[in-house]
């Protein structure tokens, strides 16, 4: 695509190196490799990198992670989210996995039989579904856990003294709750990317985030 847009060789090579570095693939080791020489996860990262090669303003992705195992899939989803935030690209992603839609989407459009039933933020789809189909799709048995997965520890951190184990600010409240239940603790300290405490979370505070407001 960059060649079709008239990019010169130097610009193309620079973009290739930039994207490989962003996706944690050393250009010296991977730039000349063929797809069959890469692992499944590496192939997926290269595929996403190629989609960003021409600096598109809007990117359409149809079930991009459906064939990956859960661990590689989660990493690929995290990579896509980080890259989207870095470049500011608008991504329209089609998926049949509501958890994936909630994990990646700022807004989610739920469609059935060719009609858009609701277009809203993930939390609104959980708390105020406009149609019985959406209620069935989002599930009723684990709504609280889905709601907790939409908020990070950094977003929910409360002021207070550092106490207990530490959790990264990027962790979801669902993950933090799981850790607290497993350890039997009632409070954890939230740390930023540099390892600096930026607040704390209590079990009671997390549970409050799992209820509609």
What positions do the PLM features span?
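Conserved ABC ATPase "signature" region
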Residues: 10-29
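Hydrophobic anchor residue at the start of the ABC signature
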Residues: 48
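Conserved catalytic motifs of ABC-family nucleotide-binding domains
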Residues: 55
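Catalytic Walker B motif of ABC-type/P-loop ATPase nucleotide-binding domains
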Residues: 59-62
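ABC ATPase "signature
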Residues: 119-120, 128, 200
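The conserved cystathionine-beta-synthase
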Residues: 162-194, 202-213
């Amino acid at each position: 695509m960059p060649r079709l847009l008239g990019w010169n060789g130097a610009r193309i090579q620079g973009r290739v190196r930039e994207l490989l570095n962003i996706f944690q693939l050393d250009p010296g080791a991977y730039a000349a490799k063929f797809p069959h020489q890469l692992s499944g996860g590496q192939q997926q990262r290269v595929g996403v990198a190629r989609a960003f090669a021409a600096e598109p303003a809007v990117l359409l992705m149809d079930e991009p992670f459906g064939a990956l195992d859960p661990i590689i899939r989660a990493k690929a989803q995290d990579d896509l989210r980080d890259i989207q935030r870095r470049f500011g690209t608008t991504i329209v992603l089609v998926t049949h996995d509501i958890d994936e839609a909630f994990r990646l989407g700022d807004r989610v459009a739920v469609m059935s039989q060719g009609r858009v039933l609701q277009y809203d933020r993930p939390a609104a789809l959980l708390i105020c579904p406009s149609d019985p189909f959406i209620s069935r799709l989002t599930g009723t048995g684990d709504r609280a856990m889905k709601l907790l997965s939409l908020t990070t520890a950094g977003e929910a951190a409360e002021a207070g003294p550092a106490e207990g184990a530490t959790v990264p600010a990027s962790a979801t409240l669902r993950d933090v709750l799981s850790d607290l239940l497993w350890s039997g603790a009632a409070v954890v300290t939230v740390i930023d990317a540099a390892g600096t405490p930026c607040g704390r979370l209590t079990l009671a505070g997390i549970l409050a985030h799992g209820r509609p407001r």
